[in-house]
A protein has these predicted regions:
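Glycine-rich and small/hydrophobic secondary-structure elements
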Residues: 28-53, 74-99, 195-229, 250-258
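Long hydrophobic segments that form regular secondary structure
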Residues: 30-72, 144-150, 162, 170-181, ...
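Catalytic phosphate/nucleotide-handling subdomain of diverse soluble enzymes
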Residues: 128-192, 197-202, 206-211, 215-219
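C-terminal, non-catalytic interaction/recognition modules in large multi-subunit enzymes and RNPs
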Residues: 141-151, 234-258
Length: 258
């Protein structure tokens, strides 16, 4: 996590000395030791302090020092190499969404009501699909019942992230079934014998990939019965938008009907 301490800024070398302090009396609020938020706080706070001491706009100071797309892949001074990213473009998008240009007017309006309004800015970066260099696998199993309902068993459990919706959409796009026909089983060790879990922005990358592979195996497995029903050969069968089709003909059958 210390590798994130240089953030998304053009810093090719750095020297870092970290001192940890244990306390049960946080001056703001308790937070779990995730690592990236702490690293982000350090670099972003340093930029705010530098901007104040230099009499420089804190947004402009960030913008001037962001890693640019043409510098990718960018090797940071600590641990990581960023493979891609448009950090300047993302900053502009965020500023527009937050109406940065209109902040002074909002601050004055708040001041007239004896209120204090502030504007915080930070550019965090997160490992997705980690751990870095060795992403863990994820379990998935897809079964289809005779009535056309689809049951997905996942080793990655939902704790508020909305897995059921995302997973159903993935299967829907691959198999051409209605998302409402997909039911999810997770957190049941009798059904899912193993699983890595939900953390570190990995679920869609890892579990989603496993689900896609399950769907692809299922589609390929069903090609032979599709060929039999359509009185064709496997080589002539293609699958698209939820239908098995005989090439160069109008013969087809939906995945659900099959």
């Amino acid at each position: 996590n210390i590798g994130c301490i240089t953030g998304v800024y053009n810093i090719s070398a750095s020297y870092v000395l970290v001192e940890g302090v244990f306390s049960n009396t946080q001056n703001v609020s308790p937070y779990r030791g995730a690592g990236r938020p702490e690293a982000t706080y350090i670099i972003e706070r340093m930029i705010d302090i530098a901007a104040e001491k230099l009499g420089f706009d804190k947004v402009e100071l960030r913008r001037r020092n962001l890693i640019r797309p043409e510098q990718m892949p960018f090797k940071t001074g600590l641990v990581f190499t960023y493979d891609s990213g448009d950090f300047p473009g993302l900053l502009i998008t965020a500023l527009n969404a937050a109406n940065w240009a209109g902040f002074d007017d909002r601050r004055m309006a708040s001041k007239s009501r004896s209120r204090i309004r502030g504007f915080g800015i930070a550019n965090p970066i997160e490992i997705a699909g980690g751990p870095e260099r060795k992403p863990h696998s994820e379990f998935a199993r897809v079964t289809v019942s005779p009535d056309g309902s689809v049951v997905l068993v996942s080793g990655s459990s939902d704790s508020g992230q909305g897995h059921a919706t995302v997973f159903a959409q993935i299967l829907s796009s691959k198999l051409g079934v209605d998302p409402t026909a997909v039911s999810l089983i997770a957190g049941d060790t009798r059904e899912a014998p193993n699983g890595t879990g939900t953390f570190g922005s990995r679920t869609v990358a890892a579990a989603g990939t496993s689900i896609v592979k399950c769907a692809e195996i299922l589609i390929k497995t069903m090609q032979e019965p599709a060929a039999e029903v359509l009185e064709s050969t496997i080589d002539e069968i293609s699958f698209e938008d939820g239908y098995y089709r005989v090439q160069k003909s109008n013969l087809s059958i939906s995945f659900i009907d099959l």
